[in-house]
Amino acid sequence: MAESLRSPRRSLYKLVGSPPWKEAFRQRCLERMRNSRDRLLNRYRQAGSSGPGNSQNSFLVQEVMEEEWNALQSVENCPEDLAQLEELIDMAVLEEIQQELINQEQSIISEYEKSLQFDEKCLSIMLAEWEANPLICPVCTKYNLRITSGVVVCQCGLSIPSHSSELTEQKLRACLEGSINEHSAHCPHTPEFSVTGGTEEKSSLLMSCLACDTWAVIL
């Protein structure tokens, strides 16, 4: 960011030296970073293990500071001679704001990683329970699924006619686990299960995930 502020058009990168303007720039940068959470996490996911490892290669900090600087210069109450002041912004102040943004960026990523770890733990527990116990209903996650006369039923009210007369609890378990594992191969979030359909059409068991915007018919 410091290098970008030393471009040939030096006059475009000068701030009023009073504390209010410095604080306004700082607050607006922090607010823009908070509002750019989705953009930041998308870049983080795309980068994977090859992502930035230091402040010079942060995901979004420099871009946020440059965007906010341009926005600050365009406000109506900005002094007309703002771009003509001889005093450049103090580099120490700039670096302080930059470091604060880097800390905020890392905090957002850390919170996201903790969320992923929690989802992975929940998924592991779910799969372990399915393997060790009778088949748990994926919709209510409380009661056991049963297959009676070709219909998959649960105490929670779930009732889905099977598409195959040969469906067993073992086959249904394998189908559920396979679908969850296939989803987890490309998305770390825990999917949700629901029943679709009504009286006129046959009910189906649906697996969906809001995080990656995917869905699949399980049964």
Swiss-Prot record:
Ubl conjugation keyword on record: yes
Keyword Transit peptide: no
Keywords linked to the UniProt accession: Cytoplasm, Isopeptide bond, Metal-binding, Nucleus, Phosphoprotein, Ubl conjugation, Zinc, Zinc-finger
Gene label: RPAIN
Consequence of substituting residue 114 to R: Abolishes sumoylation
GO molecular function, one term: zinc ion binding
GO CC entries: cytoplasm; fibrillar center; nucleoplasm; nucleus; PML body
Phosphoserine modifications at: 18
Residue ranges covered by zinc fingers (RIP-type): 137-212
Entry-linked Pfam families: RPA_interact_C, RPA_interact_M, RPA_interact_N
Function according to Swiss-Prot or TrEMBL: Mediates the import of RPA complex into the nucleus, possibly via some interaction with importin beta. Isoform 2 is sumoylated and mediates the localization of RPA complex into the PML body of the nucleus, thereby participating in RPA function in DNA metabolism.
GO terms of biological process kind: protein import into nucleus; response to UV
Region of interest (Mediates nuclear export), residue spans: 164-180
Outcome of mutating residue 142 to R: Abolishes sumoylation
Natural source organism: Homo sapiens (Human)
Reported tissue expression: Widely expressed. Expressed in pancreas, kidney, muscle, liver, lung, placenta, brain, heart, leukocytes, colon, intestine, ovary, testis, prostate, thymus and spleen.
Cross-link (Glycyl lysine isopeptide (Lys-Gly) (interchain with G-Cter in SUMO)): 121
Domain of life according to the entry: Eukaryota
Name of this protein: RPA-interacting protein
Lineage, uppermost ranks: Eukaryota, Metazoa, Chordata, Craniata, Vertebrata
Subunit structure: Interacts with the RPA1 subunit of RPA complex.
